[in-house]
C-alpha cells in the first residue's frame, strides 16, 4: 500500500481446514469448525490494524469460492490442468516421502487449493503478484502454472526468507516458540523483550526486513551499535519500532521504560501506563485507602508480595530489598506518598525480582 499497490489479504477459511504441509515434519492436526472460525475472525481483526482493507485493499476468504465447489467440479475444472509429477516434485511433498514420513491425500491436495486461490484472485481482483514466506514457493509456483494453463495468465511470486530458530525450524504456533500479534497472547512488554534478546549478528537483518526505517537510518543505528554493543542500541531500535508497529507508539514507549526498570533502572520517573504494564508482567498486590493512610509495615509487605519468605529474612538482608529503587527503611511505614504517579510502589528483591503495590481503587490495564 505504501508503494501504491492494492494489497489483498487472503484468509484461509478453506485451506485452514486442510493444513499446509510446507515446512512440516509431520501431519498437522485438523481444526474443528469453532476453532477455525475463531482463527479467521482473529486474523481479520489483526490484519485490520495494519491494512485499511476499505481504502487500501481487501480482505478475502478462500472459503468464499472453495466452499461451493463440488469434488467433481474441482477434479474436472482444476485437477485436469495439474501434472501429478510436478506435485510430487514439490519440496513439501518430496521431503516427507524421502524420509518415509508419509503424507495423507488431504495434505497432498493442499497445493491444488492454494494454486486455485491464485487463479481466483486474478480473475476477481486482477491480482498478479503473490507475496509470502519462502516456504510457500512451491505453492505459489503451482498457482502460477495453473493460471497459465487455465487462463493463459502470466502471474508472479515474491518470497522472503523465513525467520528461523537456531535449529533452522520456522517460528509458528504449531511448532512452538511463537510470538503473537494479539496482546492477550503476547503482551506488548513480552513482545518488546523478545526483540531485545535478538543476537547482535541478526539485528541489522531484522531491522532491514521488519521495520520501515530507511537503509541510511539503519546503517547509522548499526554503526553506533557496533561501537558499544553492550548498550544494545540496535536491539532497542528494533524492539521499539516493531512494538510501535504492532501495538502503537504509547505501548512501545511504556515497554521501553518498563524494560529499563526491570533490568536495573530507577523507577522514580515511571508514569501510569508504564506502571500498569509492569504490574501485568511482574504481578501486583492491591491495598486500600485505609491501609495506605495507616501505613504498611515494609517487611510484612515483602512477605505479602511473595518476595520474601518471612519478615526475619527481610530484616536480616535488608540491603537486598528496595522500595522504588531505594534500600528499604524498615523503620518507616509505606503509604500513599510512596505511590509513583499516585498509582503504585515498586518492591524489589535483588536485581530481577519485582512486585508492585497498587492502589486498590486503580484499574490495572
Where are these regions (language model features)?
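NTP-dependent nucleotidyl-transfer catalytic core
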Residues: 1-136, 141-144, 151-156, 169
Amino acid at each position: 500500500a505504501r508503494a501504491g499497490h492494492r494489497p489483498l489479504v487472503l484468509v484461509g477459511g478453506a485451506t485452514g481446514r486442510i493444513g499446509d504441509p510446507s515446512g512440516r515434519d509431520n501431519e498437522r492436526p485438523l481444526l474443528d469448525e469453532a476453532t477455525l472460525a475463531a482463527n479467521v475472525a482473529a486474523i481479520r481483526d489483526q490484519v485490520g490494524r495494519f491494512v485499511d482493507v476499505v481504502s487500501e485493499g481487501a480482505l478475502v476468504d478462500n472459503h468464499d469460492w472453495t466452499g461451493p465447489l463440488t469434488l467433481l467440479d474441482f477434479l474436472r475444472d482444476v485437477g485436469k490442468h495439474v501434472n501429478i509429477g510436478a506435485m510430487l516434485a514439490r519440496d513439501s511433498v518430496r521431503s516427507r516421502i524421502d524420509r518415509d514420513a508419509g503424507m495423507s491425500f488431504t495434505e497432498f491436495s493442499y497445493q491444488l487449493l492454494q494454486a486455485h486461490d491464485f487463479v481466483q484472485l486474478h480473475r476477481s481482483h486482477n491480482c498478479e503478484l503473490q507475496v509470502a514466506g519462502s516456504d510457500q514457493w512451491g505453492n505459489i509456483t503451482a498457482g502460477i502454472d495453473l493460471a497459465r494453463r487455465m487462463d493463459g495468465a502470466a502471474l508472479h511470486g515474491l518470497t522472503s526468507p523465513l525467520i528461523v530458530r537456531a535449529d533452522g525450524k520456522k517460528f509458528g504456533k504449531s511448532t512452538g516458540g511463537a510470538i503473537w500479534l494479539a496482546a492477550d497472547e503476547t503482551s506488548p512488554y513480552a513482545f518488546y523483550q523478545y526483540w531485545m534478546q535478538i543476537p547482535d549478528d541478526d539485528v541489522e537483518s531484522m531491522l532491514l526486513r521488519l521495520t520501515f526505517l530507511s537503509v541510511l537510518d539503519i546503517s547509522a543505528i548499526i554503526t553506533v551499535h557496533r561501537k558499544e554493543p553492550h548498550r544494545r542500541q540496535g536491539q532497542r531500535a528494533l524492539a521499539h519500532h516493531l512494538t510501535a508497529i504492532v501495538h502503537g507508539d504509547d505501548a512501545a514507549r511504556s515497554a521501553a521504560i518498563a524494560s529499563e526498570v526491570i533490568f536495573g533502572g530507577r523507577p522514580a520517573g515511571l508514569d501510569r501506563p508504564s506502571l500498569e504494564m509492569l504490574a501485568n508482567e511482574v504481578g501486583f498486590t492491591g491495598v486500600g485507602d485505609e491501609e495506605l493512610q495507616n501505613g504498611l509495615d515494609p517487611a510484612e509487605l515483602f512477605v505479602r508480595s511473595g518476595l520474601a519468605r518471612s519478615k526475619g529474612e527481610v530484616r536480616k538482608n535488608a540491603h537486598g530489598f528496595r522500595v522504588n529503587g531505594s534500600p528499604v527503611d524498615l523503620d518507616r511505614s509505606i503509604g500513599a506518598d510512596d505511590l509513583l504517579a499516585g498509582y503504585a510502589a515498586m518492591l524489589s528483591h535483588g536485581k530481577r525480582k519485582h512486585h508492585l503495590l497498587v492502589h486498590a481503587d486503580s484499574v490495572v490495564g
